[in-house]
Curated annotation (Swiss-Prot):
UniProt-annotated binding residues for Mg(2+): 89
Family: Belongs to the purine/pyrimidine phosphoribosyltransferase family. XGPT subfamily.
SUPFAM superfamilies referenced in this protein's UniProt entry, alphabetically: PRTase-like (SSF53271)
Cofactor: Mg(2+)
Protein name (Swiss-Prot/TrEMBL): Xanthine-guanine phosphoribosyltransferase
Primary subcellular site in the record, as a coarse category: membrane
Stored Gene3D superfamilies: 3.40.50.2020
Length: 152
């Protein structure tokens, strides 16, 4: 993927707060199920904004930094997801979302970002991303010193 969409920490907080507004009223939720690892940061923000204390994880491995690979369920929460917000950072091809729907058919599946191939699988999201675009998440980047242009 040649195109990149960079999400800063500030943007992630802003987008996730917008997502939280779509999930009101907060008292309808028993808890949040974060899809590890991409959903961990958004889950923390949702937990704060919706004042939800019960946060669990489902660990599904399908990416290795910049490419997809076989999906493995490492850890799962018991139950059908009823009353839970299931949060991931992104729905891309939809493979992870399909698995989550199978595991938690009564949960509310939400993502911060959505690509066209998987957008129909989520109940709510905030940012549309073109299919051929790679997302750089803030936890995958570091702030580094850059020489002034005049020194180059």
């Amino acid at each position: 993927m040649a195109n990149k969409f960079v999400i800063t920490w500030d943007n992630m907080q802003m987008y996730t707060r917008q997502l939280a507004e779509q999930l009101l009223p907060a008292d309808q939720w028993k808890g949040i199920l974060a899809v590890s690892r991409g959903g961990l940061v958004p889950a923390a923000i949702l937990a704060r904004e919706l004042n939800i204390r019960h946060v669990d994880t489902v660990c599904i491995s399908s990416y290795d930094h910049d490419h997809q690979r076989d999906m493995t369920v490492v850890k799962a929460m018991e139950g059908d997801g009823e009353g839970f917000i299931i949060i991931d950072d992104l729905v891309d091809s939809g493979d992870t979302a399909v698995k989550l729907r199978e595991m938690y058919p009564k949960g509310k599946l939400v993502t911060v970002c959505a690509k066209p191939a998987g957008v129909h699988l989520v109940d709510a999201y905030v940012v549309d991303i073109p299919q051929d675009t790679w997302i750089e998440q803030p936890w995958d980047m570091a702030v580094t010193y850059v020489d002034p242009i005049a020194k180059k």
